Amino acid sequence: MTPMTPMTAAPPPTATPRPAFPGRWVGGASLVLGPLLLLTGVLLRLRFDFFFPAQLGAYEHHPHLMTASYGCVSAGWVLLWPGVALLAARIGERSPELALWGGVLTVLGLFARTFHAGVDHLAFRLADVQGAASATRTVSETYGAFHIFSTLNAAVMGGWLLLAVGACRSRVLGPLRAVALAAASAMPLGVLKGTTPLSVAAAAGLCAALVPLGVAALREGPAPRAAAVSGRLLLTVAAGTAMYFFGQAG
């Protein structure tokens, strides 16, 4: 008789390690800070009319308020990209195709919004030098000019919709928070856009969908040592200060 070979148990499945980049700290902070900055900036210009002549007029009479508003919004969009990368990675554990397309399109949309913020900045500098009336005339005459980032307008809106579907299907977000995430697609896009009810709904939806996810990401895993936290904070402050002065040097 052939001797029976002992049965060996199959090795337990190993969990897929989560990527080190952007990581829970950078990604979690992004998911918390980005939406809150967006909502703050949107609310700061709530009382002014939506279209660009009123936005430039508001800047002429309230330069500090409008600078803070547009600064918060542009910083919020930029800070969101690590959070989008983290969200796409979580979605990709169960829905890789939606994670890929949703993540790529959303990040491309963030690039487009950053371009719009640069044009906003130039328009406000024109208002400083030439006055709001002259800046309004210049913007009006050049408003429809083609730029390469206009090809990303669909990505600005569609990326959030794909991420919302992927987040719901992969159970990263529940149905209500997925709908709130999809509301980000309603944020008006383009140059010198003021605040509308859709703007407030979109920014509030991002806060409802992403801030709790960011807090949960920050709480995952073991708490870091106090020395490590202090060191990273000091490094962040030092790097930020150096980058600020380097940028001012031109």
Residue ranges and their predicted role:
Residues 2-250:
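Hydrophobic, aromatic-enriched alpha-helical segments typical of multi-pass transmembrane helices
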